Every structure is written in C-alpha cells, then in structure tokens.
Amino acid sequence: MSPDLLGALLVAAGYLAGSIPFGVVLGRLVLGVDVRTVGSGNIGATNVARAGGKKMGVLVLVLDAAKAIVPILVARRVLGGTPHAEFWVTAVAVAAFVGHLFPVWLGFKGGKGVATGLGIFAVLAPWAALAGLVGYAVAYGLTRISSVGSLTGTALCAAGGFATYGPRHPVSWAGLAIALLIFVRHRENIRRLVRGEEKKV
C-alpha cells in the first residue's frame, strides 16, 4: 500500500475517532440523561460538568482530547519516515477535530472543539498547548467564565503553533484553522459576552 493511500485511510479513521461523542455516551450510561437536552445543550466537558459534576466534566475533557491524540500518535508511528508524513499527520489531526465538530453518529451536530483542539496541540505543539492551558487558567480565574478561558487558551495555542513552526509549516495553518473554527462555534457565547449575559461556572 502506498504511503499516500495509507495516509488517506488514517485521515478517515481520524475523522471516525473524532466523531465519538463521549459526552453523549457517558451522559446516557452514567448520568441517565442526554446532555443535549440540558444546560447549553452542548456535548462537551463544560456542559457535562453542569449536568453531572466536575469529575464527569474532566473525564469527558480527557476523552475528547484523547480521540485526537491517539489517531495522531498512530499516524506518526505508521507514516514516520515516509514522503509527506508531516502533511498526513496534520491532516489526521484536522480530521479528528472536524469529526468532533461534525460527528457522523450525531447527524453532524457536535461540540465546540476545545478539548479536542487541546489534544491536537498537546501532541503537535506541546509548548503551545501549555501556553493555552496557562491562558485558560488565568482568564477563567479572573472571570469565572468558561468561554473566556476557552477562547483565550485557543488564541494562545494558535499563536504558539506559529511561534513553534513558523508560517510555512502545515501545523501552523492547521492550528489557525482549528482556532478559527473554535471561535465560530463560540459565536453565541461571544454575543452573550458582549451583552454581559454569559453565565459564570
């Protein structure tokens, strides 16, 4: 099998892995609720924490990050040393992220991508991920508003990706695209922030 065909198959697998809706699955199995019907209706860690407590929220956060981390690590191992390996590994990362936002299992209606994006940066640009985590902690600590922390951390991750790789590397542009999509998915949160109506967590 050619490396490019293998890369394409890994991209498809990355999308399917990213599509696993851990928030919905654990909500039903552990909490007995569909998290899409409570709180904000989002399937991510913050809304799961609202429905089932902080421990459940942390578990979903870890799993949503892992569903990007695992496909990326597999792609690195399988494609390491082959032509275009960097491109395909980055494509697998983006596919996992897109899977979370548009999961085939939920009619393409998914989450906002913060945890999955963090998982991607943790593997491809660890220092950027660290900057994002610090940014989240500081912004959330000052405001007690989850979306402010998430957006701050996302912006720092994207900036850190460019600082790590420069403007010509696929990871830099993938990171920027991921950050822009996260901001788009938070557009209602941003509107509420502007109006002073965003809830504290």
Swiss-Prot record:
Q: What class does this enzyme belong to in the EC scheme?
A: transferase
A Pfam family found in this protein is G3P_acyltransf
**Any transmembrane segments, and where?**
5-25, 55-75, 87-107, 118-138, 164-184
Q: Specify whether Iron-sulfur is a keyword of the entry.
A: no
Q: Name one GO biological process term.
A: phospholipid biosynthetic process
Does the keyword field hold Cell inner membrane? yes
* Chief location category: membrane
Which HAMAP family does the record associate with it? PlsY (MF_01043)
What is the documented function of this protein?
Catalyzes the transfer of an acyl group from acyl-phosphate (acyl-PO(4)) to glycerol-3-phosphate (G3P) to form lysophosphatidic acid (LPA). This enzyme utilizes acyl-phosphate as fatty acyl donor, but not acyl-CoA or acyl-ACP.
Q: Which NCBIfam families match?
A: glycerol-3-phosphate 1-O-acyltransferase PlsY (TIGR00023)
Q: How does it assemble?
A: Probably interacts with PlsX.
The family database entries (PANTHER family) matched by this protein are listed as: GLYCEROL-3-PHOSPHATE ACYLTRANSFERASE-RELATED, INNER MEMBRANE PROTEIN YGIH
Q: Which family does it belong to?
A: Belongs to the PlsY family.
Protein name, per record: Glycerol-3-phosphate acyltransferase
Which organism is this entry from? Anaeromyxobacter dehalogenans (strain 2CP-1 / ATCC BAA-258)
**Gene that encodes it:** plsY
